[in-house]
Amino acid sequence: KSAVTRNYSEKKNERLWFKKNYDHAGNQRRIQKWNTQLK
């Protein structure tokens, strides 16, 4: 049971990590777009 719970929480953390990095990459692209529009 504890192994299953640990595995589940690891997967959850993995998803959160991917989401965070994906959002960060999206923010970087938006910032670059704004910068090029401002120039």
From Swiss-Prot:
Subunit-structure text: Component of the CSN complex, probably composed of CSN1, CSN2, CSN3, CSN4, CSN5 (CSN5A or CSN5B), CSN6 (CSN6A or CSN6B), CSN7 and CSN8.
Iron in keyword set: no
Sequence intervals crossing the membrane: none
Family note: Belongs to the CSN2 family.
Top-level taxon in the UniProt lineage: Eukaryota
Statement: the UniProt record of this protein carries the keyword Nucleus: yes
Full protein name: COP9 signalosome complex subunit 2
A GO term from the CC aspect: COP9 signalosome
Location(s) in or outside the cell: Cytoplasm; Nucleus
Alphabetized UniProt keyword annotations: Cytoplasm, Developmental protein, Nucleus, Phytochrome signaling pathway, Signalosome
One of the protein's GO biological processes: red, far-red light phototransduction
Role according to the record: Component of the COP9 signalosome complex (CSN), a complex involved in various cellular and developmental processes such as photomorphogenesis and auxin and jasmonate responses. The CSN complex is an essential regulator of the ubiquitin (Ubl) conjugation pathway by mediating the deneddylation of the cullin subunits of SCF-type E3 ligase complexes, leading to decrease the Ubl ligase activity of SCF. It is involved in repression of photomorphogenesis in darkness by regulating the activity of COP1-containing Ubl ligase complexes.
